[in-house]
């Protein structure tokens, strides 16, 4: 009997004249089916997590938008979604603000992952994973002929960002250095600034930074004496706070450097500094804003040995191999991965007057010597041709006028 009822319900749903989808933006030929995994889209945004569920398959299953709720909170209207019928197909949208994560029972799990070139606790990063589900209520009866719907979602963010997503988060690393007379611990920090004075830390507006805004970064060390300097080996960016993200863009590594990146100071003092112009990751093409996280693989080196660790770029020859054998084991520390972000960028506006923005104006057209000579020659040639044309016309005019005058001997016959 149950099978008969189920077949009857399916027959009603797929009938051509069915008013099942009402006025919603659905296609009976495409959406007369039960939901599948592809019917939910999850967007891990910079300020909120957004889920979009295919509403047409929800209708086909016998439910309405009020039957869907976050984490079984069907009695709380704040945990329900809303319909957007301006898309195809129509969708039910759920939005979770990062500032109110636990309002509808979402689950937050903190995990610790190693960074690039991990060296103990000095290179660990804490990641917060937010997960939950959207489902339909259980029927009050013992049995039901309607399928239960369940959609799962998950997003990961740096823990510092979840704690206060209105400010930039920067990580610090405690790095130990062994010397002949013992071991000391120094703390490294990666900070972002507004300009080259390195006085005011970078503030990200709620709408994000325009593309090509210049950002200044600094790695600073504490508890160091004058014998040790900071050396940045490798700095790169990722779209997430995970320094091991497969999607990354290198700013500088050895002699390879992004054209928009300028290394101001490295290996010469207890602070490393550089600047770069912000961009967006292509994977965020469907979003108005993009997140950029900065990571730097950093170490400490003795002031006398830092020049030996610096790459030799350009046409100069590589240092003699003997100079590389003079390092003692305690000449450098272990590596530490420092992170900062998110740097939120927007792509819907063009930078205008802003002291922090890179100049986007088109440079005035300038002529080089060769181009100027060619243009001058063409002008002179044109003037000569025009003068010759005028002279030719003048000669033709005089010849025509002379031919009209009749000269000769007087004929006596006509007298």
Curated annotation (Swiss-Prot):
Q: Site (Cleavage): give the residues.
A: 319-320
Query: What is the superkingdom listed in this entry's lineage?
Result: Eukaryota
Q: Which residues cross the membrane?
A: 374-394
According to the record, the signal peptide region is 1-19
User: Quick check: keyword Repeat in the entry?
Assistant: no
Function, please? Glycoprotein which is a component of the gelatinous extracellular matrix in the cupulae of the vestibular organ.
Q: Which named protein is this? A: Zona pellucida-like domain-containing protein 1
The species this protein belongs to is Mus musculus (Mouse)
Taxon lineage: Eukaryota, Metazoa, Chordata, Craniata, Vertebrata
As recorded in Swiss-Prot or TrEMBL, the protein's gene is named Zpld1
């Amino acid at each position: 009997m149950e099978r008969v009822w189920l077949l009857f319900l399916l027959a009603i749903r797929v009938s051509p004249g069915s008013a099942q989808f009402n006025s919603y933006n659905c296609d009976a030929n495409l959406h007369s089916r039960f939901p599948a995994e592809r019917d939910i889209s999850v967007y891990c945004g910079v300020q909120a997590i957004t889920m979009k569920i295919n509403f047409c398959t929800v209708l086909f299953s016998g439910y309405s938008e009020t039957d869907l709720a976050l984490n079984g909170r069907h009695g709380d209207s704040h945990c329900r979604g809303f319909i957007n019928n301006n898309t195809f197909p129509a969708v039910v949208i759920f939005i979770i603000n990062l500032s109110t994560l636990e309002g509808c029972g979402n689950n937050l799990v903190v995990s610790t992952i190693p960074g690039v070139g991990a060296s103990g606790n000095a290179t660990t990063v804490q990641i917060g994973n937010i997960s939950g589900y959207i489902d339909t209520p259980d029927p009050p009866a013992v049995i039901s002929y309607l399928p239960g719907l369940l959609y799962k979602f998950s997003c990961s963010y740096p823990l510092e960002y979840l704690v206060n997503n209105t400010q930039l988060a920067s990580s610090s690393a405690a790095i130990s250095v062994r010397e002949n007379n013992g071991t000391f611990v120094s703390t490294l920090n990666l900070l972002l600034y507004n300009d080259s004075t390195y006085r005011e830390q970078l503030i990200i507006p709620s709408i994000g930074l325009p593309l090509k805004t210049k950002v200044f970064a600094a790695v600073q060390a504490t508890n160091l004496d004058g014998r040790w300097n900071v050396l940045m080996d490798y700095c790169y960016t990722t779209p997430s706070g995970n320094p091991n993200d497969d999607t990354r863009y290198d700013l500088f590594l050895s002699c390879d450097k992004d054209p928009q990146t300028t290394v101001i100071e490295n290996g010469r003092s207890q602070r490393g500094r550089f600047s770069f112009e912000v961009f967006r990751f292509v994977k965020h093409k469907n979003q108005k804003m993009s997140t950029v996280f900065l990571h730097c693989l950093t170490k400490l080196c003795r002031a006398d040995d830092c020049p030996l660790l610096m790459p030799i770029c350009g046409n100069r020859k590589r240092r003699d191999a003997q100079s590389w054998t003079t390092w003692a084991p305690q000449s450098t520390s272990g590596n530490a991965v420092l992170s900062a972000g998110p740097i939120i960028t927007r792509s819907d506006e063009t930078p205008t007057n802003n002291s922090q923005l890179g100049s986007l104006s088109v440079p005035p057209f300038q002529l080089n010597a060769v181009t100027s000579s060619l243009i001058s020659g063409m002008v002179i040639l044109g003037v000569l041709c025009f003068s010759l044309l005028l002279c030719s016309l003048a000669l033709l005019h005089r010849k025509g006028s002379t031919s009209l005058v009749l000269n000769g001997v007087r004929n006596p016959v006509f007298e």
